[in-house]
Amino acid sequence: MNRWNAFLCLNFFLPLPEASVHPLAWNLASALAFVLLGLEFRGRLAEQSLRSLPALPVTPAFSHSTLPLVLIWCVQLWVVVQWAITSLSPYDSLMSLSQGLLYAAVFTLALLLVDSRQRVRQLVWVVVAAAAFQALYGAFMVLTGLEYGFFAEKEHYRGVATGTYVNRNSLAGLMELSLALGIGLLLAEPTRYFGSARQRLRQLIEVMLSKKLILRLLLAIMVIALVLTRSRMGNTAFFASLMVAGALALVLMRNKTTATTVLLGSLLVIDIAIVGTFFGVDKVAERLQQTSSQTESRDEVTRDTFNIFLDNPITGTGAGTFTHTFPALKSSEVTSFGLYNNAHNDYAQFASEFGAPATIALAVVVFWAFWNGIVAMRQRNSRFYQGVGFSVTMAIVAIGIHSTVDFNLQIPANASLFVVILALSAVARWAPHNSTSGRMRRRTGRKASA
């Protein structure tokens, strides 16, 4: 198995063992990512030596990503400092460091390995396949009443879709990110109908027999699973991000076709009106209507988490320490008897654990990626990379909304996929228009020299 296929397998299997929330799972994933990263750099050093190149051969996406690479790796160095000196729970900070190294390695690998349209397609299909499996599994458990997670009977969230995840909101986060990639791929490869009625009919039949129909069906299944999670903010974030990214696409994209507008409109109408009607979007709406300050304590948890940040604005309490620091520092208004493993607000939790400088550094990486997505939609002449830019924009908006009330970025499988999408923003903006993979280019070069 080559490095690229191993990277695809890593992205496929991360969601399976309960979203890799257990230390064994994320430590193994981190070790694999570092092995792949080491092998990738060794291969590029060998290529540099073989071809007598003045510098290490890297992709355009990697060469334009110096700032985010420096920031994301410096944050890991900061966690090392926290673990050694300032953390209120050094063991938890060490575990968080292992997760952070996984994300940094995956981000770097994506910039180095995703160097062609073919590889972008393969990566998107792998992510969609992994999410579709989770969607089918979760929907099957709900509709049959079997209620099993990852080789164990579910203790919580019975009657709603969780897939092999523990938390329904985390599964909703996976659906949001994967749907963004899938919809972007549909936009990246639009169907064009032209010619006589007979030719148009032939083109329609070809579409019905192509991978596009399979992709559209998988996306519909994922929307069904999203609705079946009954996640209020998950569903809200998905549809809001689709509308925001869709509006930006219609305004920014050059040479828009009627098919683009029809596709975006059909996604909203079909998914809400048809899929939602049959699979219970009304129950999600009912949960939204029943939400009040009396039924939710997340607002108080977020407020107390922010107060913890104000007590440690620079150094933070230490990465990964929320579970052990919050019970001792929460106010008396938080009366829940359950243990809060996370703050239910990624912004507040990152700030309280990492401190302001590191949190700002991570925010810069996200805004850098968001800007790349916008620029790709506006300036690229390639419809394919415009579609990738759409995916990045939609995914960031979705997670940005959902993170106000949940903790998707504390879930290793979701956070890893998110950093892959951040890396794809550089691919969308800077990848050559008709790029082929580095492996294919090297083969072509050897044949030419022979």
Regions found by a protein language model. Name each.
Residues M1-M95, L101-A129, L185-R216, M243-S266, ...:
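Transmembrane signal-anchor hairpin modules in multi-pass inner-membrane enzymes, especially those
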Residues N167, D299-N341, Y347-F350, F354-A361:
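TM-adjacent membrane-interface loops and short helices in multi-pass inner/ER membrane proteins
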